Amino acid sequence: MEFTHLDENGMVRMADVSGKPPTRRKACASGRIVMLPETIALLRRKELPKGNVLAAAKIAGIQAAKQTSTLIPLCHQLNLSWIDIEFEIGDDSIGIAATVITRESTGVEMEALAAVSVAALTIYDMCKAVDKTMEISAIRLDHKTGGKSSAAEYHPRTAILVMSDSIAAGTATDHSGAILREGLQKAGCAVEALTITPDEPVEIAATVEAWIGEGIEFIVTSGGTGLGPRDLAIDTLAPKFTRRLPGVEQELLRWGQTKTRTAMLSRLAAGVIGNTVVVCLPGSTSAAKDALEVLVPAIFHAFPMLKGDGHA
């Protein structure tokens, strides 16, 4: 198991999320503080000596969510879009629920948990003069959405085609195909083939057509998307698309452009041939890594849709 918060020497470090595209993320956490019924009665009547307990607790919880990266050393500084805290007053306890939303490259679970924790501590502080029996309990993450954990669980049968005269001739080594295979396998895909062909249209087309005939659902190609005379992937495969996937193309180009200025020269393409999704990538290792960040797991939603199972 790979731990992102440990370096090769076992020392703690922040996880590097710079390679992850920002997405909408939401986390909800909850907790409870138990107290005497008499304390609840004072709170309801707003007769506690320190004033409006729940108003102060809500503000404190919101501030705690904003300050999570300061309180917890390895948390990232995030631009939080929305924070809300709600209270449920019972006979002998107060339930606390926090919701935090952001559009960032990592989640806001810790921010939601921090909000609940500090809201509970604030209630404790403001009531402790009249109640020595209070107990904070059951602080937990209820659910989160966004990022990879909320993606569709479908994992397509996959094949990877590397197009390169030099790699096919044995004068160069394939790295991009290996990166794609490792990344897609980690994402749960069954990578059934990794094939290397020269930049020959007939061989490229024959390989892809054979895979489609075998029921391969997801084909990722590497190489042949540039402006050179032997960059023939797009010229060979794009005319076979029954439908283009412009959103996939745009996101791959946009993400690549944030890393490499020359990404705008790529002719990468994405489309559907029958019921097979085909994504044609540049041949660089950086393009392969970027594609994994962009495609996984969002692209997996396409396959149930192609089968007529809707947009769930």
Swiss-Prot record:
Report the source organism. Chlorobaculum tepidum (strain ATCC 49652 / DSM 12025 / NBRC 103806 / TLS) (Chlorobium tepidum)
The gene from which this protein is expressed is: moaCB
**Can the keyword Lyase be found in this entry's annotation?**
yes
EC assignment: the record states: 4.6.1.17
Keyword Heme assigned? no
The organism's lineage?
A: Bacteria, Pseudomonadati, Chlorobiota, Chlorobiia, Chlorobiales
What's the name of the protein? Molybdenum cofactor biosynthesis bifunctional protein
Keywords, A to Z, come to: Lyase, Molybdenum cofactor biosynthesis
Sites binding substrate sit at 74-76, 110-111
Stretch list, region Molybdenum cofactor biosynthesis protein C: 1-155
From the record, give the transmembrane residue ranges. Answer: none
One example of the protein's molecular function in GO is: cyclic pyranopterin monophosphate synthase activity
**Location of region: Molybdenum cofactor biosynthesis protein B:** 156-312
Q: Which domain of life is it from?
A: Bacteria
Sum up the protein's function in the record's words. Catalyzes the conversion of (8S)-3',8-cyclo-7,8-dihydroguanosine 5'-triphosphate to cyclic pyranopterin monophosphate (cPMP).
Which InterPro entries does this entry report, sorted A to Z? MoaB/Mog-like_dom_sf (IPR036425), MoaB/Mog_dom (IPR001453), MoaC (IPR023045), MoaC_bact/euk (IPR047594), MoaC_MogA (IPR012247), MoaC_sf (IPR036522), Mopterin_CF_biosynth-C_dom (IPR002820), MPT_Adenylyltrnsfr/MoaC-Rel (IPR051920)
Which major enzyme category is it? lyase
Q: Which family does it belong to?
A: In the N-terminal section; belongs to the MoaC family.
